[in-house]
Amino acid sequence: MRLYATALVSPQSERHAVSFPLITDPYFYAVAVPAVIMLGVSKSGFGAGFGSLAVPVMALAVTVPQAAAILMPVLLLMDLLGLAAFRRDFDFKFLKFLIPFGLVGTVVGALLFKVLDAKVVAALVGIFTLLFLAQRLLFPPRPDSPPPPKWLGAILTVTSGFTSFVSHAGGPPLSAYVIPMRLSPVKFAATMAAFFFVINLSKWIPYAWLGLLDMRNMATSLVLLPLAPLGVWMGVRMARSISPVLFYRLLYIGMLLTGCKLLWDGFH
């Protein structure tokens, strides 16, 4: 499957959308509702794991570009709620380093969007995620291990912006850089929330330019929008109440599931 912006819905679906601009397939909502809740929970800092499953799960019912477009308004509301919840916990110095590289990644994603092969992108992100987890398991870092070099952080953050633009799967690359920093759960969550607020906000004009923000996708997004506060509330409660050890274990589990699902999508 190729990520052509024009290949979002079939001609029959387009004619149906004119009379009723909303997805009505029950199967779509059966996969979209848990996907949106997972995405909300990701605003607690689990974005590298469970949140990155949202588009692959929704892609069981619609195309990857359409799933990404439907989630845009939902993501904006979630990002605003996450910013409000963690407004006192941002590391502004760290974000000043991350955000410019992330924006470079979104520009690259926008320029290459029409010619990218979705399966190749999914497979590469999946392989990278699983290799990162294997490295953490086989060669666990010592407590006094230095943080990753900034040049590696720049590469991973550009990759995060790129994969976030293509399929809202920017969590694994960014987390591969941020996790070794050993931030507290709340600080980790605040960093992810602020970074992806800026990245997701920057996608709106390119998505409109690519023709992804049509009325059918936006109307469907409005139906899913009430789930956003529920997911974010669940995620914030988790980030503020669980221990750092359990937090990172859950994060790794989410990344494992994401890596396996993306790898599966890449080769099937």
Listing of model-derived features with the role each one plays in the protein:
Residues 29-97, 156-161, 171-232, 236:
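Small-residue-rich hydrophobic segments that form or flank transmembrane alpha-helices
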Residues 67, 108, 112-113, 118, ...:
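Hydrophobic alpha-helical transmembrane segments in multi-pass integral membrane proteins
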Residues 3-27, 268:
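Short, strongly hydrophobic alpha-helical membrane anchors
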Residues 63, 117, 121, 184, ...:
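A helix-boundary/kink motif common to multi-pass secondary transporters
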Residues 233-256:
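Interfacial loop-to-transmembrane junctions
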Residues 79-89, 118, 124-149, 236-237, ...:
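Transmembrane helix exit motif
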Residues 92-102, 124-126, 147-157, 187-194, ...:
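Cytoplasmic-side transmembrane-helix entry/capping segments in multi-pass membrane proteins
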Residues 56-65, 101-108, 132, 152-165, ...:
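Small-residue-rich segments of transmembrane alpha-helices in multi-pass membrane proteins
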